[in-house]
């Protein structure tokens, strides 16, 4: 099924597919992504031919939702406030949890926020491609390649975005793993000053 992003019931329909444990393709705040609930990860890994050891990014509706999933005792209040102040933006943050790590992003996109609100929980997001290949941004190519395997593709036109910046704050020293379309100034943490937002 193909839906246009601007269609009136697009969010409700997309949400219903996700809640049925389907993997869908949606336009995100950066590029097109495979998305779904955590319980649909096995399906996603099969479609994408991705190694299950590679963790997925999860999208959240509001910055403060991250506090439910991370080890807040690992961070100072300033550090927590600093990271949350940079959302919503195309910034993926790998946090420490009680037992391992989790990668979260709070997207700066009204449509995505509406979808996350409708679903009522975080959803995974990973680039549309076969693992090891370049991410796909041309919607015609995406439809041609995945329409048989994916029950719902949301058409938001061609996206010429840049992948999100990824930072790892699950251990010290904190570091940038991937430079994307967003810049974060880590010096603010070491200097103990108020964060600069870009």
PLM region spans:
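Active-site-adjacent structural elements in enzyme catalytic cores
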Residues: 1-198
